Amino acid sequence: MQFLAFSVIAGFLAAIIVVPPAVSAGMVANASMSWFQDLPEDIAEGPFSRPSTIYAADGTTEIATFFDENRDPVKLDQISQHMKDAIVSVEDRDFYKHGAVSAIGIGRAFLNNIVNSNSGRRQGASTLTQQYVNNLIVDAAVSRGEDATATLNGNKTYAAKIREMKLAISMEQNKSKDEILEGYLNIVNLGGSNYGVEAAAQYYWGISAKDLNVAQSALLAGLVQ
């Protein structure tokens, strides 16, 4: 059912993207399906960049630490429940209820954006899984020396969104919700050069992610970029 709902949405959008309006319905269907089937289904996860430390001759005394992205990946059970609850509540409150793509969310965002088209108040429909996929795409682009902002802007096109949806569905067929949440909490930007909740918790409060309280978790969830 999840894949069927997605296919209907993807087929409609793909037809808009790849087929001129003057061709027949059969040609639209064939071109859309071919284009959709050619989209990738897998995306690499890590290893993520981590800080590099220079030590003194004794091998233990730290002299300096260098990083473009301050990151310290941890397991899900090393992150406080408050933090897990906060990020799900802010980013995707129905994360554990819907599939990789939320048809309800897409419909809600579509209607909202039509109603508020003149005000500029746009609403997104990406699930937490889709956001994780998007972060992985950006991380891979940066590792290739590409610009993160340019990649993010490119990910907002219809074609990029369909690709994101397909990757998200494939991911949920191979990973549990908890595994996806763990990955997301280790890659998401939480202000400045801090990526992932462990690095952010250490940077802002000098504590581990497992010790984050309700207020701290809510603040970090509000910093998600």
Question: What is the role of each PLM region?
Answer:
Residues 48-225:
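Peptidoglycan glycan-strand catalytic modules in the bacterial/periplasmic cell-wall system
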